[in-house]
Amino acid sequence: MYFLYLRKYAVLPCKTDTFKLLRQHFMIRIKVFIQLLIIAPLLCSVVMAQKSIYKPYKIAATEKKEGIITGADQTELYIDYLKGKNIGMVINQTSVIGKSLTLSLDSLLKLGITIKKIYGPEHGFRGDASNGADVSNSIDAKSGLPVISIYGNKHYKPTPGDLKGIDLMIYDIQDVGARFYTYLSTLQYVMEACAENNIELMILDRPNPNGFYVDGPVLDTINHSFVGMNAIPIIHGLTTAEYAQMLNGEGWLKNHVQCKLNIVKVANYSHSSAYTLPVNPSPNLNTDKSILLYPSVCLFEGTTLSLGRGTMRPFLQIGHPALQGKYTYSFKPVSIKGMSEAPPQKDKVCYGINLENYNTNNISSSNQLNLAWLIELYNAFPDKEHFFNAYFTKLAGTTELRKQIEAGKSEEEIRASWEPALSNYKNMRVKYLLYP
């Protein structure tokens, strides 16, 4: 209406200079006004275009990332869901985000998320406790949050009191893909506790560095322990979230309860993807090679031999003082705080094999764990009656492997005995895969 009013009076004939000036003045204003009407939509479109680029900031940031992106690192996918909830976090030193390796806890606190409690697994929340050491409850110095140990004094499962006031639990821990790595058991107990207390569990999934193959004897549940709770092989070939789905799907939680899961998948990942862990998953797994050899070498924890604990190269050397004269390679385990205070064969020179130069491509080409070292060193050991200890059966998941080695069975014969249980597991596994 204003535009019409101006136009109506601006075009009136003018007989005086005053009216001419007024007319010119009005005409100039009309031209400016018309130009603004034409240009304004264009300006708006530019502004809107800029907003469309920068408004979804977090999505744009994610798209710039290349390669494998962990669930935790995709904050834009779950941050809104966390707002307004009281959060508990099952985390440790591996729970990091981005190239800066910021702890996911610290990142979420900075984003204004309400974290109420931290739950720490084996090796503790900061990952500085030795293998098997009891870890006590504490207060995190940086955040001031209570840290509840779920690996200490047989306290593996969060109690209703531990979970009081928690609306949502987050599980964000790096696994290495071996049945006897205890974070799997921690996950199971956390899922049971959440299911029993009607708490949803969000899993920020991470790659499995040994996820490219499945191998080993399937656990006989008669040998159920914290280093093996269910009928899966030593190398299970699952990520944490995939295993969580299996726990639900196979009814393996106590009383067959079902845990409500909310999974944030790993982006750009397949089971054949090579993955270097940004942080050591535990004090004695401090190299890519040790992580790849861990499923094979950890069986020596069930023997009298040293596998390098008490050195800076654990899981990369195996030996014993009694093997002097049969092997020239030697090493000496000592007490190392935060890694192994009381390692097997402490302060003794051990003779055996050096795996430092072992080509791990042998694993990816064969898709098999190595039994040859176990058979070789058993045969070389002079006191065979004391080679194995009771822990070996828990690690192997079966009484048969020890009997087979003692009976002189070949690796081929031993592997044949793992069927059909191993094939049945592989078929079952397919149902729970989230990645190709």
Please identify what each model-predicted range represents.
Residues 267-346:
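Glycine-rich, aromatic-lined ligand/substrate-binding cores of catalytic
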Residues 223-295:
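Conserved anion/nucleotide-ligand pocket segment
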Residues 126-132, 202-224:
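Glycine-rich, charge-decorated loop segments at or immediately adjacent to ligand/cofactor-binding or catalytic sites
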Residues 114-123, 204:
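Short internal beta-strands
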Residues 175-187:
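Glycine/threonine-rich flexible loop motifs
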Residues 136-166, 178:
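Glycine-rich oxoanion-binding loops at beta->alpha junctions
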Residues 1-61:
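Bacterial Sec-dependent N-terminal signal peptides
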Residues 314, 319-417:
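Conserved functional hotspot residues or short segments at active or partner-binding sites
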